[in-house]
C-alpha cells in the first residue's frame, strides 16, 4: 500500500516541502536561518495574538494596557518581552539570512530573491508600527519623525502625511490604524513566505560552492530536520536568555515614559535594527535626498542580480570580493553605531563616509572585483 504522505493531497505538499525534498548534501549552518525565520514568525504571531487580547489601541489607555499586561496578566511580562526581543531575534536571523544570500550568490534565483526583498520591507514596516503601539515617548516621537519623512515627496507629501496620520498630528487615529496594520501584516508575511518557499523549491537550494548539486542530493528528513531543530534550540536559548535576564537591553529607557507631545526626547532614535538605515538617512543634509537614500539602502538588494559580473556564483573561490564583502559587513556595523549617536562633529562625518562607502562597495567595487577575478582566472578569452 502506498504511503499516505505521498498520496493525500495535503500531506503530499508537506512531504514535498519538508520530508522527501532533495537538498544539497553540503549546505552549512548558514542555511538554517530560513527555518529559524519561520519559527520567529510563528512565535511573533502567537505572542502577538495573546498581547492583542489585553492591549487597547487608544492614546489614553495604550501605555496603561501594556503596564497592565506586564503586572496583572498571568505571564504577561513573559509574553510581552518574548514579543519585543523576538523581534530582535527576527532581525538578527533576517540580516544573517540576507548576508548568506549575498555571500553565496543566492540572488541569482531572481523570483525567490525579489520576494525576499519584499518580505524584508514588510517585516520592517511591521516592526516600525509595532514599536509605536506601547505609546511611550520614543514610540510617539519615532512615529512622528519617520512618518514626517513622507512630506519630502514633492506636491503630494503634506497631504499624504496628514492622510496617514488621520489628522494634523500623530494621535488616536494614527495609533488605531497602526495597530490594525501591525495585526494584519504578519499574516501577509506568512503568505509571502510560502510563496518564497514555492519559488525556492522550483529551483532547489543553492550550496556553498555555488555549483550545480543535482548529482549529490539527500532527503530533507531526517538530515536537515534534526539540523534545523538544533538551530531552533540554540536560538531559543539566546532568546530566553535575553527575555529572562536582560529584557530591556535592546530597548530604549525613554519608552518607559508615557508619550508627551509637548516634550521631545534629547535623542530620537529607532530600534537597533533600523539604526544603519537611520544613519544613511541622517548623513544627507537634504530631506528628499535622505528619504531616497533610506529607501535605496534596502532596495539596492533588488539590484544585486544585475550587479553580478563574475562567472562564479559564490564568493567561496573569490578572495578579492570576499575582502570587500567583509568590509561591507564592518561598514554596516559602523552605520549601526553611528545611527545611535547624537548629531555631533565626529559622528556626522563618520556617518557620511560610511554611507558613501556602503553604496560604493555594492554599486562600484564589487562588480569591478568580479571582472578582475575573472581576468585573473583567464575565464575571458
Swiss-Prot record:
GO molecular function: metal ion binding; ubiquinol-cytochrome-c reductase activity
Keyword Heme in annotation: yes
UniProt-annotated location(s): Mitochondrion inner membrane
Topological relation to the membrane, as annotated: Multi-pass membrane protein
Cofactor note: Binds 2 heme b groups non-covalently.
Claim: Heme is one of the keywords in the record: yes
GO biological process assignments: mitochondrial electron transport, ubiquinol to cytochrome c
Keywords annotated in UniProt: Electron transport, Heme, Iron, Membrane, Metal-binding, Mitochondrion, Mitochondrion inner membrane, Respiratory chain, Transmembrane, Transmembrane helix, Transport, Ubiquinone
Binding sites annotated in the UniProt record for heme b b562: 83, 182
InterPro entries reported for this sequence: Cyt_b/b6_C, Cyt_b/b6_C_sf, Cyt_b/b6_N, Cytb/b6-like_sf, Cytochrome_b, Cytochrome_b_C_euk/bac, Cytochrome_b_N_euk/bac, Di-haem_cyt_TM
Gene Ontology terms: cellular component: mitochondrial inner membrane; respiratory chain complex III
Binding site for heme b b566: 97, 196
Cofactor requirements of the protein: heme b
Quaternary state and interactors: The cytochrome bc1 complex contains 11 subunits: 3 respiratory subunits (MT-CYB, CYC1 and UQCRFS1), 2 core proteins (UQCRC1 and UQCRC2) and 6 low-molecular weight proteins (UQCRH/QCR6, UQCRB/QCR7, UQCRQ/QCR8, UQCR10/QCR9, UQCR11/QCR10 and a cleavage product of UQCRFS1). This cytochrome bc1 complex then forms a dimer.
Family the entry assigns: Belongs to the cytochrome b family.
Extra information: Heme 1 (or BL or b562) is low-potential and absorbs at about 562 nm, and heme 2 (or BH or b566) is high-potential and absorbs at about 566 nm.
Protein role: Component of the ubiquinol-cytochrome c reductase complex (complex III or cytochrome b-c1 complex) that is part of the mitochondrial respiratory chain. The b-c1 complex mediates electron transfer from ubiquinol to cytochrome c. Contributes to the generation of a proton gradient across the mitochondrial membrane that is then used for ATP synthesis.
Protein name, entry field: Cytochrome b
Lineage: Eukaryota, Metazoa, Chordata, Craniata, Vertebrata
Protein's gene: MT-CYB
